[in-house]
Swiss-Prot record:
This is ATP synthase subunit a. Signal peptide: none annotated. Coiled coil: none annotated. Belongs to the ATPase A chain family. Key component of the proton channel; it plays a direct role in the translocation of protons across the membrane. Keywords: ATP synthesis, Cell inner membrane, Cell membrane, CF(0), Hydrogen ion transport, Ion transport, Membrane, Transmembrane, Transmembrane helix, Transport. PANTHER family: ATP SYNTHASE SUBUNIT A. It comes from Pelagibacter ubique (strain HTCC1062). Disulfide bonds: none annotated. It comes from the Bacteria. It is found in: Cell inner membrane. F-type ATPases have 2 components, CF(1) - the catalytic core - and CF(0) - the membrane proton channel. CF(1) has five subunits: alpha(3), beta(3), gamma(1), delta(1), epsilon(1). CF(0) has three main subunits: a(1), b(2) and c(9-12). The alpha and beta chains form an alternating ring which encloses part of the gamma chain. CF(1) is attached to CF(0) by a central stalk formed by the gamma and epsilon chains, while a peripheral stalk is formed by the delta and b chains.
Amino acid sequence: MATNPMNQFEVYRIGPEIKLGAIDISFTNASLFMVISSLAILLIFNLGSKKNSLLPSKMQLLSELSYTFVSKMISDTAGSKAKPYFAFIFSIFMFVLFCNMFGMIPYAFTVTSHIIVTFILASFIFVGVTIIGFMKHGLGYLKLFVPSGVPAVLLPLIVVIEIISYLSRPVSLSVRLFANMMAGHTMMKVFGGFVISLGIVGGWLPLSFSVALTGLEILVAFLQAYVFAILTCIYLNDALNLHH
């Protein structure tokens, strides 16, 4: 194999080393692609909203489809009460989607293939949703951990399970995204290495697999952004509408 498939996930510094005390806050390739993803989102929606016409341009159509898609996802999952949080969900979905998609470009860096990035995103969502829950319901939000209709003898055990399940949300949310992106890109690199190693004659089969895997990985990149956003909507729904 030409190169180690894990080298693509290496974070390296761009420019001078910058430290805040003992903490290294240098600009890295991960930082670069987060900035690129954010700027690309701003550029597309800025161009898409410049001229609102009955016959939309490609950028306007993309902007409107994205807006409608996320708006419907929020309505179907969290209801009308979640509408004030549209910008929050929309920003998360688009950021994860663009980070995933930029990772499909050769020699680009997949930001979401690092657990620290996905865990910080998931933790931010977890803390934000928890704050919203307590702001809306006060201490009544704790009823989320007490399901109705549970026999008194089982209640202590069920409450413990519910608390553990709740606290594990940022872990499951972050690991799901990180694991899928890392696994997919590793497989693509492995098959790409086979193509190079086997040459023109023997490389046709792994090349075919590599092309098919690339198409699948593009689909996975979108689906993982969708799953990340829709789970955020579900958590927000729990905070806004106590079903227990």
